């Protein structure tokens, strides 16, 4: 194996190792798996990534990722359009969808507020949220930020921001441990948290 190829493979392993949940050993196994049958496995992955890169866009309404400018959730006639869940990222949106227990709409903040990083609240897409609440006649806002310090800080800030809107504001409840992130919880736990949500003041 010449030096150029060796460096290319090392770079592939390094890139895999930077994916969430993967260390260098897992990355090496994945790279080897793909390279051992590269005409099928590697090319299939490459083709899929190219297609995703071409098609995936951010939903203009909620911030979800989909192949349409207005995602399947926002455009669905079967969703309860009187309830909106506020999540930090698309990962939490997908976690709630996997639970199969939430049939409302979403609003992806894209960030949370961290005292340590002194982030500006303007990054949270709250003006868009307030506009949606009035325009879509939202009856309940579920704050589904994570149970981390940053998530709690963000939740309180959102509550203050939405005071001028009459919607009921609730918070995910039982089953979310302190410091817990929705994306790492099983579907049953997320379902319980949705069902047992409590008023948030």
Swiss-Prot record:
Keywords: DNA damage, DNA recombination, DNA repair, Metal-binding, Zinc, Zinc-finger. The keyword Magnesium does not apply. SMART domains: TOPRIM. SUPFAM superfamilies: Recombination protein RecR. Residues 82-177 form the Toprim domain. The keyword Ligase does not apply. GO terms for biological process: DNA recombination; DNA repair. One of its GO terms (molecular function) is zinc ion binding. A zinc finger (C4-type) spans 59-74. InterPro entries: DNA_Rcmb_RecR, Rcmb_RecR, Rcmb_RecR_Znf, TOPRIM_dom, TOPRIM_RecR. May play a role in DNA repair. It seems to be involved in an RecBC-independent recombinational process of DNA repair. It may act with RecF and RecO. Belongs to the RecR family. NCBIfam families: recR (TIGR00615). This is Recombination protein RecR.
């Amino acid at each position: 194996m010449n030096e150029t190829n060796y460096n290319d493979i090392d770079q592939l392993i390094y890139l895999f190792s930077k994916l969430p949940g993967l260390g260098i050993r897992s990355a090496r196994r994945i790279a080897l798996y793909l390279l051992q049958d590269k005409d099928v496995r590697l090319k299939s992955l490459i083709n899929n990534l190219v297609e995703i890169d071409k098609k995936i866009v951010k939903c203009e309404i909620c911030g979800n990722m989909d192949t349409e400018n207005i995602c399947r959730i926002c455009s669905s006639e079967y969703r309860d359009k009187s309830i909106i869940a506020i999540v930090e990222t698309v990962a939490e949106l997908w976690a709630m969808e996997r639970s199969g227990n939430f049939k409302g709409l979403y609003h992806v903040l894209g960030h949370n507020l961290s005292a340590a990083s002194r982030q500006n609240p303007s990054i949270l897409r709250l003006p868009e949220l307030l506009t949606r609440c009035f325009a879509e006649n939202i009856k309940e806002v579920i704050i589904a930020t994570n149970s981390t310090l940053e998530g709690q800080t963000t939740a309180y800030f959102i509550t203050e921001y939405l005071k001028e809107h009459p919607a009921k504001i609730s918070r995910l409840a039982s089953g979310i441990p302190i410091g817990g992130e929705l994306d790492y919880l099983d579907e049953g736990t997320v379902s319980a948290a949705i069902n047992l949500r409590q008023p948030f003041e």
